[in-house]
Amino acid sequence: MEKVKVFLSDPQILFREGIHFILSGEEDFEVTGETTNNEEAFTLIQANPPSIAILSMHNAKADGLDVTHRIRRNLPSVYVILIMDKKDPEEIFLAIKSGASACFTKDTEPEHLLDIIRVVAQGSLPIMEELFTPALASLVITEFEDLAALNEEVGGLLANLAPKELQILNTIAANNNIEQVATKLDLSEDAIRRNIRLILNKLVSNDQARTVIEATQRSLPSFIRSGKRDLKNADYITRAEFNEFKDRLMERLKSLIV
């Protein structure tokens, strides 16, 4: 039986060693490395990719969300599970957008943690279940509303919610569980889950695309970023150079969304 290779990163050594101890007692797991900071974790994971990386969400030397972004962008075969201080809806939402497959708090029971790691190793997304809560559904709706203006600027390359997806989210946000959503919308629970999975994928791809957009905007001359046309105190670029820049941006966004 091929073992699930796990990398651990958490600044609290006793907690990290506790997870190591739990995993070492299971035949299907192998801890391939561990560290106290996420920046070093990323370097070690790149050198020897595990099946799963378990990272602290908040780390003084490297934010877990940023490292999750980088892992999922550069090493898509590596799944990430984030360790959270508490189950806060806004932090869970950030974890979802980063591309994490799951998250857990430090008071999670060992058996439940083992279950989470096993289902993530099979390619499942336990974090998706969080989108069935009213608070998270409301945050998702707001996120897509806020992205509308940016999406116009980049030619509609960001993913929008489909009408059915928005309907499902609105129904969840109105404090309905999945069974009630299925009844109210005359959909099967499987169909609802498929739509939620699509929404999750859109959140991740949009967040990656926004990172690219913000980075490219910072590289533009200031008069373009501000929308001003006073060239006296600004660097001059030709129309051809600007069109080339736009084309490169579009290609990078397409590669993230496809």
PLM features: residue spans?
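Short amphipathic alpha-helix used as the core "switch/output" element in two-component signaling
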Residues: 65-77
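Short, flexible helix-to-coil linker/hinge segments that flank and couple to helix-turn-helix
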Residues: 93-96, 107-156, 220
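Basic, Lys/Arg-enriched C-terminal extension of HTH/homeodomain DNA-binding domains
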Residues: 200-258
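Conserved phosphotransfer microenvironments
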Residues: 38, 54-68, 88
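Regulatory hinge/linker segments at domain boundaries
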Residues: 138-170, 224-236
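Conserved acidic segment of CheY-like receiver
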Residues: 2-15, 19-23, 53, 161
